[in-house]
Amino acid sequence: MANAAKTIKVTLVKSTIGILPKHKDCVRGLGLRKINHTVEVEDTAAVRGMINKVNYLVKVEGE
């Protein structure tokens, strides 16, 4: 059986209006669209980097 990838839930809790374009790209890269939208993403270094860049906009569960 393949290794089950660890996942984390990320929720957008603040609007992306008026933020840096790079930060907006990170939010979209995580798959988030609207406020209170939650997605489940794989726990990888790339995803962690995107979350750290926009940590003031998101809430993370399942660390």
From Swiss-Prot:
Quaternary structure (record): Part of the 50S ribosomal subunit.
NCBIfam families, alphabetized: rpmD_bact (TIGR01308)
Cellular component, GO annotation: cytosolic large ribosomal subunit
Superkingdom, taxonomy of origin: Bacteria
GO molecular function terms noted in the UniProt entry: structural constituent of ribosome
GO biological process, one term: translation
Organism: Hahella chejuensis (strain KCTC 2396)
Pfam families named among the record's database cross-references: Ribosomal_L30
Annotated keywords: Ribonucleoprotein, Ribosomal protein
InterPro entries hit by this protein: Ribo_uL30_ferredoxin-like_sf, Ribosomal_uL30_bac-type, Ribosomal_uL30_ferredoxin-like
Protein name as annotated: Large ribosomal subunit protein uL30
Similarity comment: Belongs to the universal ribosomal protein uL30 family.
Coiled-coil regions, chain positions: none
Disulfide bonds: none
Keyword Glycosyltransferase applies: no
